[in-house]
Structure formats: C-alpha cells, structure tokens
Amino acid sequence: MYLKSFNQFINESTISAGSTDADQLASILKKYVGKKEEGNNSGEMVKGFLKSVGLGTGNPWCMAFVYGVFDEFCKAKGIPNPLPKTGSTLAFWSKVPAENKIEKSKAVNDPDLVKPGQIFIKSRSGGGHTGIVIKVEGDSFVSVDGNSSDMVKVNRYKIANMIGFADFFKSDSLSAQFAQSTSSIISSNAPTEGGGKEV
C-alpha cells in the first residue's frame, strides 16, 4: 500500500516544505539530465531505473525514470515511495488515487492547478509517456523526461495535450521550492517543443 502524498511526511516533520528537501530532489533530477541510454533501452542508468520497477533492460523506461528519481529521494530520506510501482505509464495513471489526480479538463480550465513536481501523463501511439514538471508557463509546462530521444531530456508541452497530472507533493510550498531548485536546468537546457522521440 502506497501513501497519498509527500504532504503527509511534511505534517509529520519527516521532510520539510523548505528548500533542503526540494534541493535534494532537484539534485537527483539534475544529475540525469542529458544522460543517454546505451543501446536500445539499456545501459547502467536505464538498467537501474527499470530495476526499480521490477523490469529488465529493453523495456521503455520513461515511467521507470520518474519512479526511480522519486525512489532515490525516498530512500535517502528513509520514507516509503508514495508512487504506484509500475513501469507502465497508463497503468500508473489507473492506480493514482483520485485525490492525487488532476484530469485534463480541470487543468485546461485552470492551469494554476498544474505545479512543479507533478507527474504528467501523455497518450501516444501504443501506450503513454510521462515525466516530471519543473515549470509552468501559462497553458504550457516544461518537464524532464526519461526515454525522450533515447535520453533524459528537457521538453515543453501544452497542458491540453495531456491525459492529466499526478500530484504526490500536495504542497504548494514544496512545489515552489522545487521550481526554484530546478530553474538552472532550463537555463542550461533549451526545452524541445512537443518533446522528443518516445520509444
């Protein structure tokens, strides 16, 4: 059984809503930006992400990247990972509790609901794609995605093109600190409009 949000840990003072924990999560994310897979959905980095969700090399790894980043943070903090453990984007979305979901219609009508630290869910031919939101820009957002053009990549998408967003922060202050902590990612990596190749 997974937990509902990081806000529970904030309330228990296991993690803080301040910069320290946001910086730690951002640092984990930053170290992977620009790293490429080796071969087809393989290499040590990809192997580690896929292993975190119980899969072997050769599988698509965008969802495993998201889970793996949060899992690395949770293990460092000694807390359970609240994300559903799966390597499938659409299976992940189906397992996200209703209180953690922001459906597309709500996000389009109120883009302020979309916040840094959330996990976007996007449909694609043959499955889905996902990544971690780091900045919101009106009706668009910037994210860091695994398995985008065979690497960990910075992309920009339209909110209207998503299935929805999963919010496991449930904390405006943590989201704001995470945005600040990840701002250097955007300044050194120009986002690709519409994302990269997803396989």
PLM-predicted stretches and their roles:
Residues 1-13:
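Short acidic, low-complexity intrinsically disordered linear motifs used
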